Amino acid sequence: MSVDAALKALAEPRRREILRLVWSQERPATEIADHFREVSRSAISQHLGVLKEAGLVFERRDGTRRLYRADRDEMKKLRAFLDDYWTTGLERLRDVAEAAQRKKETK
């Protein structure tokens, strides 16, 4: 999974909604498309392709149907990447706050 591709894929609200739909269970493309009545099936197919290319969903064929489910392992990697940024940022903030407190106490 490319973090850049995953973040770009998740920047689109419909793709995030698709990911929510396939998070807990595998769903056929037709069922996913039915959830978005205001969007064409080809647009949903393109969204699914972007999510698949980004490594966020698996596609499985069952006869003529295409079934999709979230790739939770890849999502864990993305979360770890984001957690690292969050943790690093919080650690820096803590260090600055502690330095300011020490400076205040020595005055």
Segment roles from a protein language model:
Residues 1-2, 20, 24, 75-107:
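Amphipathic alpha-helical dimerization/coiled-coil segments
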Residues 2-40, 65-76:
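N-terminal helix-turn-helix DNA-binding core of bacterial DNA-binding proteins
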Residues 57-59, 74-77:
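Alpha-helical interaction segments
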Residues 48-49:
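Short, hydrophobic-biased segments on the C-terminal half of alpha helices
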Residues 52-63, 69:
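Beta-hairpin "wing" of winged helix-turn-helix
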